[in-house]
Each structure stands twice: as C-alpha cells, then as structure tokens.
Amino acid sequence: IAPMIHVHTAITIFITFTHLIYIFGYLWTKVTIFAFMKTYTSNHIVFFSPTHTSAKIARAIGESIGMGRRIEIDLTTDENSSPIEIKDSITIIAVPVYAGRVAPIALQRLRRLKGNNAPAILVAVYGNRDYEDALVELRDETIQLGFTPLAAGAFIGEHSYSRPNMPIAEGRPDVTDLQIAEQFGKDCLTKLEKDETLSDFYLKGNIPYRFVGPSTPAAPVCTEGCFACGECIEVCPTHAIALSDEGKIETEITKCIKCCACVKECPNGARVFDTPYTPMLHQKCAARREPELFI
C-alpha cells in the first residue's frame, strides 16, 4: 500500500506543479501583453517641412493618436548632427516629395534618428503631381534607422511653385485632408493594438527608385519691395540666405533647394521665384488628387 501512496502523492505533486507552471505562464503572458500595451504612452512627431504642409499632416495624425506625451522634432532648419534616440514611442515621420522621391536634405536629416524598433507612421507630402517612389524610399530608410513601419500615407500639400495667379494644389492640406489624416491616425492605433507583430503592408512604389538627375541651380530673388527684415534668412532650411555687409539680402544659389519657404513667408511679398515649371504644373496638375493610405 505504501508504494501506491507514494505514487499517488508523486502524481498529485506533478499535476499541481504542472498546473502552477501553466498558471504562471498564463499570468506572464498577460503581464507581457499588458506591458506591451503600456509601452506606448507617447508619440514623436518628426518632420521636415519648409512650407508647413508636412507639419500640418503630421500634427493631425499625432493629435488623433493621443497618448500622454507628444514630442515634436522639427528638422526643417536644424543642421545639428547629434543622434536623436526614440524609444517606446509611436513615431510619425513626414517629409516632402521632390521629383517623386524623398527630398534629399530631408533624408539627410532623418539619419540622426535612432528608432529602437519604434512603430513608425510614414507620410509623404507632394504637390498634386505624383509621389511615385517616395513612400518606398522612406520605408527603406526608416527601417535602416531602426524603426518598424506601421502604416504609410501620401498626402497633398500646396506645391512650392504655386503662385496666386497660377495655383497648384492651393490651400492643401485643407479641412478634408486633415480629417482624413486624423482618421488615419486612429486606424493606425487600432492596427497597433490588434497586430503586435506589425505585419507587412502593401506600399505603392518601385525599386530601384525613380532616377533623379542633378537640377540646374536656381533661387528666388528679392524685388524692390524688400526691406531686409531677415524673415527669409530665418526660414531657409539650408541657410542659403544671408544679409550682406551692405545690408542687402543675398542668396547662395548652390545651396538653394527651391522649397520657396522664403517666398511664402516674406511679409512684404518681395521674394519671387520665376520658373517655367509653375505654368506647366498649374495646367497639368489642376485636377484634385486625394490622399492614399496604406495600413
């Protein structure tokens, strides 16, 4: 009888131990999931946005996501090279499209970021022509920087070459665009809550990326209405504009990226950029285009 009692006791102990392991495993899983969900209590809004269109979209997405803490990183005029660590934060990264690609200087400044596997919502803003391979390029770059792409969107912003008499996507992003951006942010958050592994998603674009050759150096100029207030100096992303010893505004043409921030921000309307692309884009890109989202 004694051996049978010992066997029964051993079986009971084994079953109890196995049950405890199961309970511990279950509780650990719950704790892990809870910890995962609690990890994202902040969001970073990162943008390069000379004429503020990318910033508007990024902020609309960020505000709809919420979170207890929101941190903005404006790389537009920041030439600092020190690394920026982002950890445990939903990150919105918004950049302008130049000739179907991410603006080169935007890519250059994004390379300061260290993603640490943070989920990233990628945004390309273009002037109503086409974004072509910009989102694919942005995705590849952010993966290299350590981010995990969560979703992506192509939005429309008023073209840098738009003029009052020849508008190109004038006033974009508008109220409708911002509403779409807000809903996009909410949809991204829903995906994050349901899909912890952040599965891949379809993205429009090509590899290799669209070839973009060197552009002819050109820059906006000042008219007689300029009174050297210096506003253009402050907003230039490449610091290509300076005040001469004679008190005149001068532009280093080889540094200009033709973003036309100086044109749009001049309080006296005294900064102009004449380019044959303005009438061409005004004519060919008149039809309204809508945001395209990939989740």
Residue ranges with predicted function:
Residues 7-9, 20-25, 35:
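Short hydrophobic alpha-helical segments enriched in small aliphatic residues
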Residues 32-44, 49-76, 81-215, 274-295:
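FMN-binding flavodoxin-like domain, especially the glycine-rich phosphate-binding loop
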Residues 250-267, 281-295:
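Short microdomains enriched in Cys/His and/or Lys/Arg
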Residues 222, 227-252, 261-278:
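Iron-sulfur cluster-binding cysteine motifs and their immediate structural context
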Residues 200-237:
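A mid-sequence, solvent-exposed acidic-amphipathic segment
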